[in-house]
Amino acid sequence: MTHLNFETRMPLGTAVIDQFLGLRPHPTKIQATYVWIDGTGENLRSKTRTFDKLPKRIEDYPIWNYDGSSTGQAKGRDSDRYLRPVAAYPDPFLGGGNKLVMCDTLDHQMQPTATSHRQACAEIMHEIRDTRPWFGMEQEYLIVDRDEHPLGWPKHGFPDPQGKYYCSVGADRAFGREVVETHYRACLHAGLNIFGTNAEVTPGQWEFQIGTCEGIDMGDQLWMSRYILHRVAEQFGVCVSLDPKPKVTMGDWNGAGCHTNFSTAEMRAPGGIAAIEAAMTGLKRTHLEAMKVYDPHGGEDNLRRLTGRHETSSADKFSWGVANRGCSIRIPRQVAAERKGYLEDRRPSSNCDPYQVTAMIAQSILF
């Protein structure tokens, strides 16, 4: 990759934008930023429009269009694609009544594009709504500079071996906390169910958790939290990698996942451990199918991560156990002790599509 000049900045850019973002909000008009998943199935795009007044319901946000030939979702001769708003959140960057709007992407026949999996997920969640499906997803990521070098790593050589970085404190081991704390506050402002955050095992790697969310809300909130994370990183002049195992970490370093916690009302009730253990049958049956949708490249990304080392299971073999982070599915020790609660699917990669992951878990256990 071409090395960029990190000193190339717009003069006084931050001071100027702060001046205008600090202006009093317009008394009636608002800005709505439409956010969508592009043709990669993992990257996000956005564009903003003005409304004369704040829409009261998600249905009041109109369908919009965009150039799908520039996002890997259409050919130039038939490039128009549609954005269908599905969820709106307070905008932590613009404040006031401004909104971030998560959108589905639709083709010229108003059908979901190839990388738009929300509609299929929503149909499944509607079918199982009486089970009260709860999800929580643990998003791991790596903060990198613009030539994809992890924050805190020496330019030549490697940092000290992992061991001192997890949940760490100190300038010699916790790299990028400014991004992490800003993202946390921004998610809270946006009304997302952000549960917490922590430094992870690999230096420069962090995690945040979104949940508890019920049904389709899980996918909407995780995608929007990712968008906010990328925007925050942009303001600090760094980038976020959701690659589950970047080349620089291919040695003795933990990869990045998106462990997904799941429960039903039955699992959360007294004696729910029986339902949790019964779920393993369905999860085992669909293991190979699940591996194909747990990253956006048909399972290829996870092959680099799920090696049976670094707190992972083997990609080609299903396993489960209590408190075992080397299994496909972990039952937390506290859950086993209380005999109710939830299970943790440790297979999804950090760049997974949460719509596909939550739909697969629901199908595996409840269909």
UniProtKB/Swiss-Prot annotation:
Domain named GS beta-grasp: residues: 30-110
Pfam families, A to Z: Gln-synt_C, Gln-synt_N
BP GO annotations: glutamine biosynthetic process
Chief localization: cytoplasm
GO MF annotation, one: glutamine synthetase activity
GO cellular component: cytoplasm
Transmembrane segments annotated in the record for this chain: none
Reactions performed catalytically: L-glutamate + NH4(+) + ATP = L-glutamine + ADP + phosphate + H(+)
Entry keywords, A to Z: ATP-binding, Cytoplasm, Ligase, Nucleotide-binding
First-tier enzyme category under EC: ligase
Subcellular location: Cytoplasm
EC code: 6.3.1.2
Domain GS catalytic, chain residue ranges per copy: 117-367
KW ATP-binding (keyword) present: yes
Family membership noted in the UniProt record: Belongs to the glutamine synthetase family.
Annotated protein name in UniProt: Probable glutamine synthetase
